[in-house]
Amino acid sequence: MIAWLVALALLYAFFNGLNDSPAIVAPVISTHALGSRQALLLTAAAQAAGPLVLGTAVATTIATRIVRPESMSAQAVLAALVAALLWSVLTWTTGLPTSSSHALVGGLMGAALASAGPRALLLPGFVRVVGALVISPPLGLLIGYLGVWLTLRLARQAKPTLNNRLRRWQRVAMLALGASHGASDAPKAMGVLTLGLVTVGAQQGFGVPVWVLASCLGFFCLGTSIGGWRQMRRLGGQIYRLRPVHGFGALVAGALVVLSAAMLGGPISTSQVMASAILGAGAAERLNKVRWLILRDMLTAWVLTIPATLLLSAGVLEVLRRLQ
């Protein structure tokens, strides 16, 4: 059982990095601040530093604040991972801008409810997590809008060389977002794997073991270094035709929101925050040139992901019980 828990947690970490990396590097690639391979590798390096510098508060949230740990069996944790992983693979192949956080929360809820009923849910923690998931994209949109609006007005008389400076600042903002993303998203896999280890009696407390941190972070960064090229094209040009000012504004907005969530232990969707930040950055210049249909896709993902993974994990748990 431990081998299955480790394998699925690492796969989840890998697809998490694969799904979210386009959101981080798309602005710098589309504005020619960095080449694609260079951007992905630098982002992966920043992500590796994130949990080491900023901590793993999100892991504690995943392991102890959504469902009652004592209500979870090893099979239940396994079912939650299977559901989150299957949903991540499905949405990656279809291009739906979903969230691995939504998927994991839904998976944990479904497995806990199937195991012990409603009493297995920790309502305050659940409300906190869902609140962070819901409020973070609008915050990204608002900060992206305000950042670009302010920059455009301050730079009206600027020389054309301002674009070169903005490209350099974009690289710094990308690294900040990468580190924040590493502290926000990599601990999700660490938290669920730690929960699984506790359920099988492999450890007593919920502190993340060093080998769990290193392995989950390694697979997470590996997924990032490969990147999702289709998502990069969508975020880099299909939402709005980005220039350096938009890329910089969106990256700063994303870094602020994701860093805040990571420090507070709130698991959010970096890809949805960045898509919203790009929408806001574009809207600050030309409202009618923004492709607002991406909001429809995001709302669809919001509505579908938690219910779908909840039902899926409950179904997987029932199958595992029958196979036992």
Map each language-model feature to its residues.
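Multi-pass alpha-helical transmembrane bundle typical of ion/small-solute transporters
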Residues: M1-Q324
